[in-house]
Structure formats: structure tokens, C-alpha cells
Amino acid sequence: LKNYDPADEMLGGFTSRDGTIEFYNRINALLQPGFKVLDLGAGRGAWYYAKIPEYKRILRNLKGKVAEYIGADVDTAVLGNPTTDRNVLIKDGVLPLGDGEVDIVVCDWVLEHVVDVASFKREVDRVLKPGGFFCARTPHSFSYVSLAARVIKNSSHVKFLRWVQPNRGAQDAFPTAYRCNTLSAVSRRFGGWKSYTYLYTAEPSYYFGSKPVFHFMNLIHRLLPRAMTGSLYIFLRKP
């Protein structure tokens, strides 16, 4: 059975180990009406065009829940992102935002693509208010997803992702680097920040749209160490 989705069998359209529900539940708990939130690496807003249940769409949508929701990316596609109040283009690694302008920085499946982590961290630190939150979701460096991405050349990455994730668009696949994708790397890069980071294993995402393969991968998730199946759910508070 191709294009199988285990969430279709669950009331509400999501499983008990839905990583997006887990991540955005926690972000929503931090929101305040007067906040400014930056979606760093927002891209074209791919989730907006995806077929997802209404509950997940409401949870994922931060626009209207805060004073301003800003999208930023190095890709000009962000300028047409319909999910935000305002979009800005990152040029030469610099965010066109003021110092201490935002209360929360959200980085969803972006950190694994960052090559110059030091510059990235400096910009996050600059635009984030003291006491603000940096919230990121990224694969662990030792997960089978990360290991496979290292083996497969970036030029073949798009074809591979379309094979194992049939519902993923080619325009939403990008080269990977994995420079800040372990708990120790996060602690080292963000020294002095209060960390609420944890390792979370969601249901398998890479199963070729096949029900038997999904259940096999689910078994693998139970047997392998968490670092090989999980992702980092990074929640840091700036001092």
C-alpha cells in the first residue's frame, strides 16, 4: 500500500508520537500576545501547502497568536511565504532585524543545514531579547537519517527523499551539514544559555509510503539506541 499514513487510522489525524505535535505544543505554551516571533529558515512555508489535519494546522500556524510573526531565509522563496505577517531575506549571513527585536526564534528542520554555526549563533543571539527562547527541531547527528544523508551525495539527496518520502516536494530538500546536532554540540555552542533540550523519537518518517515498511521501521525504532532514531528538540533560554 503506497502513500500509507499511520495518522489516517487515528482519531484527530495524528499519532501518539507525532513530532510536529510535540514540538509546536511546547512552542504554543511559550507564546504571549505581545511577542514577536521569528521563523528562521521559514522558506516558502511548505507546511501550508501540505495535506495535514486541521488540528495540526492550527497548532503549526503562529500567525495571529502573537504581535508579529516574521519569516526569514536565504532563499528568495521566503518572500512569498503566506504563513507570516512579514518576510525578510538574509543577506551575507545577516538578519535585517534590530538587536533584541524578537522574543522567540523558531528553527524547524533548519539547523542540520547550517554550515557556519558560529555566525548563525551570533545572529540568533543578536536579534533575540534577553530571556527569549530559541526553539529548534533537528535530526541527531547519529540518527540513521543523518547517517544516510552523509552517505548519499547532496546531488542525489532530492531523488532519495522523493523515494522514501513520496509526499515531499523536491523544492523542500536542501544540502545537509550536521554541525550542531548532538547534545554536547548544542551545549558547547550555546554555553551559558539555560537548556531544556531533549532527545525525542517520533514515528518513522522514511518508509516509502508503505505500511509494511512503516511497521518494520517502527520495530527498528524500538530496538536501536535513541540517538540513532531520535531528533533533538532544542529549547534554550537566553540569559
What is the meaning of each model-derived region?
Residues 12-15, 54, 94, 178:
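Pocket-edge positions in alpha/beta enzyme catalytic cores
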Residues 26, 61, 185-189:
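Amphipathic alpha-helical segments that form well-ordered structural scaffolds
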Residues 2-6, 115-123, 127-129, 133-239:
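S-adenosyl-L-methionine-dependent methyltransferase catalytic module, highlighting the catalytic core
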Residues 18-21, 52-53, 86-87, 215-218:
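Short gly/ser/thr-rich secondary-structure transition/capping motifs
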